[in-house]
C-alpha cells in the first residue's frame, strides 16, 4: 500500500562521480520489496514534481533502505546536499517489484544491469542468495569510473563487468558476455538503459521468467496522468503505465 511518510536521512556518500548512495529510515521500509521505487519530494518550493528513485537494498530489521541515484538535474542535485538528520517527504513504496517466488537452491538466475540501472538488482541478488539460488550477474558501464556495486554483488555470486571503452573488465556491452554464456537460466532480471532493455527484451522474448525493470519520467506517480505509458504489442488502444503497472514487465509484453 502506497503511503506518505517523512523519512530520516541516516547517511549519504558519493560512491562514484555524480552518483550518491542515500540511506533513509522509516516505518515504510517494512512494506518494501525488491524492484520497487520511492517517489521523493525535492525539499524546496521550486520543484513541484517528485523524483522516482529505485530501492537498492532493504534492511527491515533496522527500518532502513538504501537508494542510489545519479545527479541528472537541479532536483537530484539538491538531494545530494542532504546529510544525517535531514528529512525527506517520501511517497511509496511504489511499483510491482520483481517476482522472486518459487526460486530455491535448484535454480540458477541471471541478473543484467547497466549504469544507474544496477542498484535495484542488489536486493534481488541478496534475497536470491539467501534462498540458495545460484546467481550470475552481468554489469555494463561506460568506463571504470562509473563502475558501482561490483564488490557488493560479488558476495552473492559470479559477476562479469563490461565497459564501453575497455577501461575495466571486458570491453563492449553486456551482450558480449551474455551471448557466450552456456548456462540455462530459470529466471532473468534486468534494469538498464533503453538500448540494453531492448536487447534483453529481444534475446529473452520467449523466456517464461525474464523481466525488465524500466525507467521513465513520471509526473503524478500514481497512474492518473499517463505521462509514463508504454505501448503493448499488437494493440493500438491498450497501454501500460510504468509507475502503476510496472516498473517491472515480462519480456515481450511492452513495446520498447
Swiss-Prot record:
Superkingdom, natural source: Bacteria
Molecular function terms from GO: 2 iron, 2 sulfur cluster binding; electron transfer activity; flavin adenine dinucleotide binding; metal ion binding; oxidoreductase activity
Q: Is-annotated flag, keyword Iron-sulfur?
A: yes
**What keywords were assigned to this record?**
2Fe-2S, Electron transport, FAD, Flavoprotein, Iron, Iron-sulfur, Metal-binding, Pyrimidine biosynthesis, Transport
Please tell me where [2Fe-2S] cluster binds in this chain.
220, 225, 228, 243
Isomerase as a keyword?
no
* Binding-site residues for FAD, renumbered to this chain: 51-54, 68-70, 75-76
Give the record's pathway.
Answer: Pyrimidine metabolism; UMP biosynthesis via de novo pathway; orotate from (S)-dihydroorotate (NAD(+) route): step 1/1
Q: Quaternary state and partners of this protein?
A: Heterotetramer of 2 PyrK and 2 PyrD type B subunits.
| PANTHER family in the record | DIHYDROOROTATE DEHYDROGENASE B (NAD(+)), ELECTRON TRANSFER SUBUNIT (PTHR43513), DIHYDROOROTATE DEHYDROGENASE B (NAD(+)), ELECTRON TRANSFER SUBUNIT-RELATED (PTHR43513:SF3)
Q: What is this protein's name?
A: Dihydroorotate dehydrogenase B (NAD(+)), electron transfer subunit
Amino acid at each position: 500500500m502506497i503511503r506518505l511518510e517523512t523519512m530520516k536521512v541516516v547517511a549519504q556518500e558519493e560512491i562514484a562521480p555524480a552518483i550518491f548512495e542515500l540511506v533513509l529510515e522509516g516505518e515504510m521500509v517494512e512494506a518494501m520489496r525488491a524492484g520497487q521505487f520511492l517517489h521523493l519530494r525535492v525539499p524546496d518550493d521550486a520543484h513541484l514534481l517528485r523524483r522516482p528513485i529505485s530501492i537498492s537494498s532493504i534492511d527491515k530489521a533496522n527500518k532502513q533502505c538504501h537508494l542510489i541515484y545519479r545527479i541528472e538535474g537541479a532536483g537530484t542535485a539538491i538531494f545530494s546536499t542532504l546529510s544525517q538528520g535531514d528529512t525527506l517527504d517520501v511517497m511509496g513504496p511504489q511499483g510491482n517489484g520483481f517476482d522472486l517466488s518459487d526460486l530455491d537452491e535448484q535454480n540458477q538466475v541471471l541478473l543484467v544491469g547497466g549504469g544507474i540501472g544496477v542498484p535495484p538488482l542488489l536486493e534481488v541478488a541478496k534475497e536470491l542468495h539467501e534462498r540458495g539460488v545460484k546467481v550470475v550477474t552481468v554489469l555494463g558501464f561506460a568506463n571504470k569510473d562509473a563502475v558501482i556495486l561490483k564488490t557488493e554483488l560479488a558476495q552473492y555470486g559470479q559477476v562479469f563487468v563490461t565497459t564501453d571503452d575497455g577501461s575495466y573488465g571486458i570491453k563492449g556491452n553486456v551482450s558480449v558476455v551474455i551471448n557466450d554464456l552456456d548456462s540455462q537460466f530459470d529466471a532473468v532480471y534486468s534494469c538498464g538503459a533503453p538500448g540494453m532493455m531492448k536487447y534483453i527484451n529481444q534475446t529473452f522474448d520467449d523466456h517464461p521468467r525474464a523481466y525488465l525493470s524500466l525507467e521513465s519520467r513520471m509526473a503524478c506517480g500514481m497512474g492518473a496522468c499517463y505521462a509514463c505509458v508504454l505501448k503493448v504489442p499488437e494493440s493500438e488502444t491498450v497501454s501500460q503505465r510504468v509507475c502503476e503497472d510496472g516498473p517491472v514487465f515480462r519480456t515481450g509484453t511492452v513495446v520498447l
